[in-house]
Curated annotation (Swiss-Prot):
Virion surface side: 1-20, 73-80
CDD domains reported in the protein's UniProt record: HCoV-like_M
Note: Isolate N2 belongs to genotype B.
One cellular component (GO) term of this entry: virion membrane
Molecular functions (GO terms): structural constituent of virion
Entry function: Component of the viral envelope that plays a central role in virus morphogenesis and assembly via its interactions with other viral proteins.
Gene of this entry: M
Bilayer topology term: Multi-pass membrane protein
Matches recorded under InterPro entries: M_CoV, M_HCoV-like
Quaternary data: Homomultimer. Interacts with envelope E protein in the budding compartment of the host cell, which is located between endoplasmic reticulum and the Golgi complex. Forms a complex with HE and S proteins. Interacts with nucleocapsid N protein. This interaction probably participates in RNA packaging into the virus.
Subcellular location, record wording: Virion membrane; Host Golgi apparatus membrane
Major localisation: virion
Keyword annotations: Glycoprotein, Host Golgi apparatus, Host membrane, Host-virus interaction, Membrane, Transmembrane, Transmembrane helix, Viral envelope protein, Viral immunoevasion, Viral matrix protein, Virion
Organism: Human coronavirus HKU1 (isolate N2)
Protein name, as recorded: Membrane protein
Amino acid sequence: MNESIFPHWNSDQAITFLKEWNFSLGVILLLITIILQFGYTSRSMFVYLIKMIILWLMWPLTIILTIFNCFYALNNIFLGLSILFTIISIVIWILYFVNSIRLFIRTGSWWSFNPETNNLMCIDMKGKMYVRPVIEDYHTLTATVIRGHLYIQGVKLGTGYTLADLPVYVTVAKVQVLCTYKRAFLDKLDVNSGFAVFVKSKVGNYRLPSSKSSGMDTALLRA
């Protein structure tokens, strides 16, 4: 490979490079750390989307670096490790796409390609399906309505709703199954505010309906 494109650096040149770019690299790493640490859907959807882009780029960048290491390995041991890491990275990257496509088929939501989690919370509010990622496999989900603003697990979904608009069932879609949560408790705090608790009641191989249906038996369709 042409050394003019990939020049060989000695230790002094590397130290000089770090001295010149140390401040910029520090700022970039600080921003990335803050975004990864505080990027949650319950805080800022914009910051969370940036976080998802950063996480999404990590695997292809890793694959590029491992392939690069295969061409510039220090010895045969490093070459073998670089090839192994390249294979592992590519396999995991392919599995990510396979699982994301399967989840997309189940939900029809682009949140299926979220690199952080394969759990998607789905709630039908007056015929409009909201889909948002949830990090953990919760046994209960909490829906809160505050002066018409709807929140699920602290994540704001929309406005103009009342407690009466809350459905009887909420689902969490996974790659393998669809978990159904049934409303077990509802408490009205005032005219426009209150909350409801949904408890996991059913797990099966289902997909979300493409349109609103009446009744739970028709709302869950076999995949």
